A protein has these predicted regions:
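Feature captures the catalytic ectodomains and active-site-proximal regions of enzymes
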Residues: 1-385
């Protein structure tokens, strides 16, 4: 049994299209493989040593003797968004998934702004890349003060606003009101504040993003661990994804560098019976959605460079799991998430390097952690060993 488990989610790092990718307009998606192909290289010596390239159809360099157990996981939830991906990792499959929209009803937007005591005027209200829509509508937004509303192929209601035009406190209030409205037939997974700064032609999104999710619609591993008195620590946006439910301790970091540092610190000081649950957001947010394979590759290489520090912070009784929540292939024709398998690497002093094969659900992670802490069999998924 492992006394501590560190689960790190490399947000948006997929490893090849799922069989149903055609239903999501994602034929040919392969986040890691296409980044490698586009750049001509991907310098990840530590991840390769663990066995990343040994995973089926990885399209990456393999090694003779991997140091970790390796495999890939399919998503059972019929979705490709962050919330559903993380919930499934924690053993809950949402069925049916959240609703997606091409546009939001005018009646709802009017009610939203009325409740916020703002003029009934908005910009956008269509699927778009976050950086593209502020480039297109940012100047008009600065002139009119109207918030920019947009969505994507995921279940999101996103509100972009210049911090000098709509203060953060007001933007967050707008999000809170929208979150209360978008339920029932309008059940959206996340409302997201997307603040930006700068002048026309040079707008830049800030790290003051804030996500407004809904509590999981069923019991998750985090709930079970909390009930059993285990310690849980959420790093990055984990608390937002689960609405703090089952997350005893929180370190709300906003970028990969800070999240990695927080994870290493947690490994140095946390005691036994602990789950450290980290989300690394930059791959997805800064590069995947912006169709930037070179930036994505550099971010992967930067993580690989920090990986030895994480490994060195592990104790002999620790387990490190690296995986993802969905794909976000930066080489696709769209800027949305991609329906892909996700990589799975499990490393520890007591782990026998082996091929874990193709898992049928992300919930195998929850089943593994639940069994590890001596709590029995999770209601879905199979333990990795």
């Amino acid at each position: 049994m492992f006394e501590r488990i560190c689960l790190i989610v490399l947000d948006g790092v997929g490893i090849g299209e799922l069989p149903d990718a055609i239903e999501y307009d994602d034929i040919g998606a392969h986040t890691l493989g296409n980044i490698y192909k586009t750049r001509g290289k991907l310098d990840l010596p530590n991840l390769y040593a663990m066995g990343l390239g040994n995973i089926e159809n990885s399209r990456l360099p393999s090694v003779q003797k991997p140091t970790a157990a390796y495999g890939r996981m399919a998503q059972l939830t019929r979705a490709k968004d962050t919330t559903c991906g993380h919930w499934e990792l924690m053993g809950h499959v949402m069925d049916p998934p959240f609703k997606t929209f091409k546009e939001f009803p005018e009646k709802v937007l009017n009610e939203w702004l009325q409740l916020a005591n703002m003029p009934k005027a908005w910009l956008g209200n269509y699927p778009a890349s976050g950086t593209a829509i502020i480039d297109k509508l940012g100047e008009e937004h600065m002139k009119t003060g109207a918030p920019i509303v947009y969505t994507s192929a995921d279940s999101v209601f996103q509100i972009a606003a210049h911090e000098a035009i709509i203060p953060l406190s007001t933007l967050y209030k707008l999000c809170e009101i929208a979150r209360k409205l978008l339920v029932g037939d309008l059940f959206v997974g996340r409302v997201i504040a997307r603040p930006f700064v700068g002048a026309p032609g040079a707008f830049k999104r800030t790290e003051n993003r804030k996500d407004y999710a809904v509590p999981p619609t069923g019991k998750t591993l985090l709930d079970a661990l909390e009930t059993q008195g285990k310690t849980t620590l959420g790093i990055g946006k984990i608390e937002d994804i689960f609405c703090k439910r089952g997350v005893k301790h929180v370190n709300h970091t906003t970028n990969n560098s800070d999240s990695i540092a927080a994870t290493i610190d947690a490994l140095k000081f946390n005691n036994e019976d602990t789950l450290i649950f980290t989300n690394l957001i930059d791959f997805d947010m800064k590069y995947g959605h912006r169709n930037d394979p070179d930036g994505f590759g550099q971010a992967l290489e930067a993580f690989d460079g920090q990986l030895p520090k994480i490994i060195n912070a592990l104790r002999p009784v620790d387990l490190l799991i690296l995986t993802s929540d969905h794909g976000c292939d930066p080489t696709t024709k769209h800027t949305d998430h991609t329906r892909e398998y996700v990589p799975l690497l499990a490393y520890g002093a007591n782990i026998k390097p082996t091929d874990l094969g193709t898992r049928t659900t992300f919930a195998d992670i929850a089943a593994t952690i639940y069994a590890n802490f001596g709590l029995g069999k999770w209601h879905m998924g199979e333990s990795l060993w």
